Amino acid sequence: MNELQRVQFEILCEFITVCKKLDLQYYLICGSALGAEKYKGFIPWDDDIDVALPRSDYLRFIEEGQKLLPDYYFLQNCKTDKNYHHFCSKIRDSRTTYVESDQKNINMHHGVFIDIIPLDLLPDDKHFSIKYRFFRICQLIHLKSPETYKNIIKFVLRPFVPISVVYSVFEKYLNKYSSKTLSEYCNFHNAKNNRLYMHKDIYGKGINAVFEGKDVVIPERIDEYLTLYYDDWRAELPEEQKAGHHYYEVLDLERPYTDYIEKTTHNGRRMKLRKTKKSIG
């Protein structure tokens, strides 16, 4: 694994330790599950780690996980970092810097991270789909766009759509289903709707796998999971598709992200970025 992957792997190991202490069900998902099954570790060109927990376990991790993690790890979500506007949580390494290109002007924690995603038991019906689309629109208003005109529109709309209120209302809606007998898990972090829902039996109790020499848990019906997610997951990708999907503005595995923040008299704190990008090889 490369140096970035090594830092992410260390975070994963601490995450697993906390899950074991709290007796929480977790799964490696998405490319991390594919990596465990196909490569016994990272997909060689992958640049992130994704893990998921059923919502009840996710909420317990959010509530109790921080105090069980090393002091240099920060459990980031919209409640612990007011400028973080994503549905999932992250564990970030405060000793490092990883500023993604689309977040370079956002004053939030910018350490190297892994994603922690809740799996929600929810009905697959028209009314819920409408509510979900409304939530996504509200969320996107608070995220940067490549196009300048979209950012101007979003800037005008933001005061009328406070993200903390949106998250609070939607989370209450999600929580009311967490104890009900439903058959579908929903991964809201996945933007591709055809992969949004999967039967919870596909995840099941999980099965053991090896990831870079570490025992991990992946979905129980892993072949079915990966087939639904990637179609022919055993096939080799063309060389031009062998690339990560995160684009960084600054990557520094030896200095904390706070070294890249400066104070200004008019705008409070803002990101101060180096002109060159550091290699992760």
Where in this protein do the model-derived segments appear?
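Conserved catalytic core of two-metal-ion nucleotidyltransferases
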Residues: 1-20, 65-124, 143-146, 154-231, ...
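The substrate-binding groove and active-site-proximal loops of carbohydrate-active enzymes
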Residues: 1-7, 45-52
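Active-site nucleotide-donor binding segment shared across nucleotidyl transfer reactions
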Residues: 16-49, 58-59, 201, 228
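A surface-exposed partner-binding patch
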Residues: 34, 41, 47, 54-59, ...
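General alpha-helical segment detector with a strong preference for membrane-spanning helices
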Residues: 35, 52-54, 119, 217
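Short, basic, helix/turn surface patches
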Residues: 52-62, 265-267
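A short secondary-structure junction signal
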Residues: 126-131
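Short, cationic low-complexity segments
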Residues: 135-150
